[in-house]
């Protein structure tokens, strides 16, 4: 018996809602941009992978920014892989950009983290590029209005967070503001999580100081406002990932809003990551749900955390193997002023999941 046209249409619409295809993080494919591409003419913008029309237009009008944004894309991949290296989902699928699997195409907890991290990373990289003088359109951040304490003075070159936030959000949010970019629920989710990433970035701005004085006495400290490293921001976002709230798209009055699924008596908090679709346990390989599985992943036999062999291997057990490690040893300090070391080799036992 052939399925009815109505059934096929309903199935198609259901698939669209489940995948929630959105182009918001496809720009991470810029990480693959060849270094030989000079990016000094506006026609080069069309050659860049993963950009939507509005991002191509931003590229043409802000050509000097693009090398910095390419660097941000590389930082997102490196930082995400490092942050989740000890978990079943290890962010490996981010390297498939712009052709993601369902772990990042759907409105999952994992996509929530990547959207937040990518929004933070692009603003972070631009803010730092202003400080180092790599961008002609910006310079150091403003001197804070508050008076520093005794023995302190404002100086140095602050990270230009304000410029980073303005230009970063223009670029990273552009795909979600297109009319044809997935379901409304997914767009709202991605915009919310991107803003959470920028909030964590703003909260990371801290006072950094350098000592001045006779014989290193540090009688005066020159201080400026600087951002924490992206890896620290990613760790804060990972904690939000672990406590993320599942939401539903529910009518309230004449409009629909995202509200917590299990506690919809309160609105979504501005500081929490949110997701629409539950994730698999990532134990077994299943590309239909975007899971690479944990077979052959390295695990820690003595750990009680997420990298433990019990958790990482999902109860399947693990295999030991011997690995040779070369490290520096027998180091000697020579006056003045250098250190020489020998190279020593030792064998260590490691474990991989069955």
Swiss-Prot record:
GO MF entries = cytokine activity; frizzled binding
Cysteine pairs bridged by disulfides in the record? 80-91, 130-138, 140-157, 209-223, 211-218, 283-314, 299-309, 313-353, 329-344, 331-341, 336-337
Residues the record marks as carrying a glycan:
40, 90, 300, 304
How does the record describe the protein's post-translational processing? Palmitoleoylation is required for efficient binding to frizzled receptors. Depalmitoleoylation leads to Wnt signaling pathway inhibition.
The domain of life is Eukaryota
User: Per the annotation, which location comes first and is thus the protein's main one?
Assistant: secreted
The UniProt function text for this chain reads: Ligand for members of the frizzled family of seven transmembrane receptors. May play a role in the formation of dermal structure, both limb and feather buds. Is likely to signal over only few cell diameters.
Put simply, this protein is called Protein Wnt-11
Q: Which organism is it from?
A: Coturnix japonica (Japanese quail)
Q: What is the lineage of its organism?
A: Eukaryota, Metazoa, Chordata, Craniata, Vertebrata
- Gene (name only): WNT11
């Amino acid at each position: 018996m052939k399925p009815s046209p109505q059934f096929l249409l309903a199935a198609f619409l259901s698939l669209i809602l489940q995948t929630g295809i959105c182009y918001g993080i496809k720009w991470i494919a810029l990480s693959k941009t060849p270094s030989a591409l000079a990016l000094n003419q506006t026609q080069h913008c069309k050659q860049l992978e993963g950009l939507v029309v509005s991002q191509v237009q931003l590229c043409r009008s802000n050509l000097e920014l693009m090398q910095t944004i390419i660097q941000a894309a590389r930082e997102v991949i490196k930082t995400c892989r490092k942050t989740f290296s000890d978990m079943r989902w290890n962010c490996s699928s981010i390297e498939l950009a712009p052709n993601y699997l369902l772990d990042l195409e759907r409105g999952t907890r994992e996509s929530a983290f990547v959207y937040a991290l990518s929004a933070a990373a692009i603003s972070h990289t631009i803010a730092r590029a202003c400080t180092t003088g790599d961008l002609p359109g910006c310079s150091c951040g403003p001197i804070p209005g508050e008076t520093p304490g005794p023995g302190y003075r404002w100086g140095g070159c602050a990270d230009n967070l304000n410029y980073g936030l303005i230009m970063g959000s223009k670029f990273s949010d552009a795909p979600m503001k297109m009319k044809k970019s997935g379901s409304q629920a997914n767009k709202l989710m991605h915009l919310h999580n991107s803003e959470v990433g920028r909030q964590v970035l703003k909260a990371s701005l801290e006072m950094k100081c350098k000592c001045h004085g006779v014989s290193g006495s540090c009688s005066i400290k020159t201080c400026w406002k600087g951002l924490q490293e992206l890896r620290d921001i990613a760790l804060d976002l990972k904690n939000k990932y672990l406590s993320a709230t599942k939401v539903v798209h529910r009518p309230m009055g004449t409009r629909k809003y995202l509200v917590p699924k299990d506690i919809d008596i309160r609105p979504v908090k501005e500081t929490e990551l949110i997701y629409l679709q539950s994730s698999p346990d990532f134990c077994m390989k299943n590309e239909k749900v975007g899971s690479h599985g944990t077979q052959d992943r390295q695990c820690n036999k003595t750990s009680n955390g997420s990298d433990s062999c019990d958790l990482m291997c999902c109860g399947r057990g693990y295999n030991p193997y011997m690995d040779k490690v070369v490290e520096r040893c027998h180091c000697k300090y020579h006056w003045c002023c250098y250190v020489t070391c020998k190279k020593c080799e030792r064998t260590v036992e490691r474990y991989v999941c069955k």
